[in-house]
Amino acid sequence: MVMKCLRALFATTTLLTGIGAGNATVRIVDDPGGWIGTYVDRYEGVRVSGERVIIDGSCVSACTIVLGTVPHDRICVTSRARLGFHAAWDPDARGRKITNPQATQTLYSMYPFEVRRWIDQRGGLTPRIIYLSGRELASMFRPCYLDSQALSR
């Protein structure tokens, strides 16, 4: 009886945590972004691990680095996905945002062609955030549906 319970517990844990590199899933829900280096490191780890990415809400600013780091075929979007893009910036001595052209170009060059074209059609990366969602986003990335693996993250 104890052995049967342990097997059931292990099976449930395996299903919920997505054990196995090819089965694990990272779910992005409401990510406002942050420092570029932090996100490059995070998503490089996801790329190397073989994990899949579900974008199921806001992914803004540095969060969008996922698009240029994780292979396209391992990213999917739900109907709630919303990507926000803007120029990269650094704070000045007073804490004001100063656009960083080099970092902006680096970010831009990481994005897939379809995303770069969409950004270009809206005037490029500027201090103003532009959002990609709905049909336009769905035309660029495959749709995904939540399952128990995604809900556990």
Describe the role of every protein-language-model region:
Residues 25-81, 87-91:
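Cleft-lining beta-strand/loop regions that shape enzyme active-site pockets
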